[in-house]
């Protein structure tokens, strides 16, 4: 399903590492996130045997040491013999934006605090993972003449075997480079980063690391 979804909503397709052997070829696609979400929703709604109920799950119901269902914030209960919880970033989620932090599942959405406490009470092992999101810049604020164009593949390869061909125009990407002035500004403001001022405890990703973690390592 995910392969079909990206084939239908992708805005650029590119096969990475093409200059090397097939073993390391890596297909990459960028999607219109709103179209992607809507496409998946509509595809699932067409499936038989699936009922859709919108609401916030606050607790997991257990009876005789077996799963029995869930209760929603509205007080409604739905009973089942098996339950799959796809938590994403919502369980007691925290967002850090520079020195500021607040509870959230993701930007603009509240965290799932009650569900987190319910799972803790059932003695699930608990941990926390970190994700990083690059800052967004407004298109009108960018001087594209100073950037290098990176176009998608002329004959892109679909992600799904069920897709015969990819249709629609692709959108160009642009490559920018930093310089010593940028690196100097980053180093001067490392104390404002939650990774360095103690707000976040843990180790960041090894690959695709943030610019300022690279600068800190170079010092």
Question: Language-model segments: which ranges?
Answer:
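Conserved N-terminal/central alpha/beta ligand/cofactor-binding core
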Residues: 1-59, 86-103, 110, 114-116, ...
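A short, glycine/Asx- and small/polar-enriched loop/turn
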Residues: 62-68
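Core beta-strand elements of the Rossmann-like FAD/NAD(P) dinucleotide-binding domain
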Residues: 73-82
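Residue-level recognition of phosphate/Mg2+-coordinating polar/acidic sites
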Residues: 191-192
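Amphipathic alpha-helical blocks
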Residues: 198-211
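Conserved small/polar residues in nucleotide/adenosyl-binding loops
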Residues: 212-219
């Amino acid at each position: 399903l995910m392969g079909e979804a990206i084939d239908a909503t992708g805005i650029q397709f590119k096969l990475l590492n093409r200059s090397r052997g097939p073993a390391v070829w890596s297909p990459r696609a960028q999607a219109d996130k709103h179209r992607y979400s809507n496409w998946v929703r509509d595809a699932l709604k067409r499936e038989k045997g699936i009922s859709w109920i919108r609401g916030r799950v606050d607790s997991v119901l257990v009876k005789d040491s077996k799963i029995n269902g869930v209760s929603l914030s509205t007080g409604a209960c739905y009973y089942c013999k098996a339950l799959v919880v796809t938590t994403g970033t919502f369980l007691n989620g925290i967002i850090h934006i520079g020195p500021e932090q607040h509870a959230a599942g993701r930007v603009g959405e509240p965290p799932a605090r009650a569900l987190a406490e319910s799972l803790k009470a059932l003695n699930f092992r608990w941990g926390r993972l970190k994700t990083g999101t690059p800052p967004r810049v407004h298109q009108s604020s960018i001087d594209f003449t100073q950037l290098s164009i990176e176009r998608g593949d002329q004959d892109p390869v679909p992600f799904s075997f069920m897709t015969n061909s990819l249709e629609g125009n692709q959108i160009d990407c642009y490559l920018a480079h930093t310089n010593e002035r940028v690196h100097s500004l980053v180093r001067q403001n490392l104390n404002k980063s939650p990774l360095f001022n103690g707000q976040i405890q843990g180790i960041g990703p090894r690959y695709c690391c943030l610019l300022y973690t690279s600068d800190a390592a170079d010092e």
